[in-house]
From Swiss-Prot:
The keyword Ribonucleoprotein does not apply. PANTHER family: ARGINASE/AGMATINASE (PTHR11358), GUANIDINO ACID HYDROLASE, MITOCHONDRIAL (PTHR11358:SF26). PROSITE patterns: ARGINASE_1 (PS01053), ARGINASE_2 (PS51409). Keywords: Hydrolase, Manganese, Metal-binding, Polyamine biosynthesis, Putrescine biosynthesis, Spermidine biosynthesis. The gene is speB. This is Agmatinase.
Amino acid sequence: MSTLGHQYDNSLVSNAFGFLRLPLNFQPYDSDADWVITGVPFDMATSGRAGGRHGPAAIRQVSTNLAWEHNRFPWNFDMRERLNVVDCGDLVYAFGDAREMSEKLQAHAEKLLSAGKRMLSFGGDHFVTLPLLRAHAKHFGKMALVHFDAHTDTYANGCEFDHGTMFYTAPKEGLIDPNHSVQIGIRTEFDKDNGFTVLDACQVNDRGVDDIIAQVNQIVGDMPVYLTFDIDCLDPAFAPGTGTPVIGGLTSDRAIKLVRGLKDLNIVGMDVVEVAPAYDQSEITALAAATLALEMLYIQAAKKGE
């Protein structure tokens, strides 16, 4: 298999074990998995501090501290008893070739989705979401986007590979519908005419969680949803290990409650991106990312018990 290597993980920046100590499966297409975790160690599209290629490894490493809890608080059940989740390791591509990464990731995602799997991906910088959206749109059609970030990433700078342009490109390619999409935690300059509903960090920090979730549900409706979480949505006090930190963000507590509140949406794909462990302190950024990823899986598992 050319995309993910052979029966061992030959990524230069990967772990030898899976997320939550889950089994590594380098042939996930023919497995009985419900959700497949894929690491995307890519940071060539970064405009700030590089190092996101080491994000997947950092998330997996710290996730071992989350694996022990079976009846996770406050869910009171074990996600692993309801979902079959496997980790297929990292996407392998020629470091330095952004186009190859994009094409291989899209092909990998298309193959998984065609086999009836769902994807949770770990970046890497946020550009990796664009090839994932392309694959998901081929399978599910135009989607709603629920996007946690400090930046809208809707900047039209003419650069093909840039972690600040994906959500300018995606609507133009018909991948997502901005009128049914929400960007949460924004606290940098953005174009107010791009069609997205923007819930900036000031209002997200001041409003009640239930009120925000009700608005998100109303905007998204019953559309298929792609959920993407850039870790710089969190305040640097909770996530210093990222490429473009911005003061004034969400607490980890608020972010977790918001993610839990998305359980009624028709989420078809998910990612957590922009962890750069070289700038982390005591692995708190990686831990936040791993915890948010785990909560994403729990909102999927909760539906299995309904």
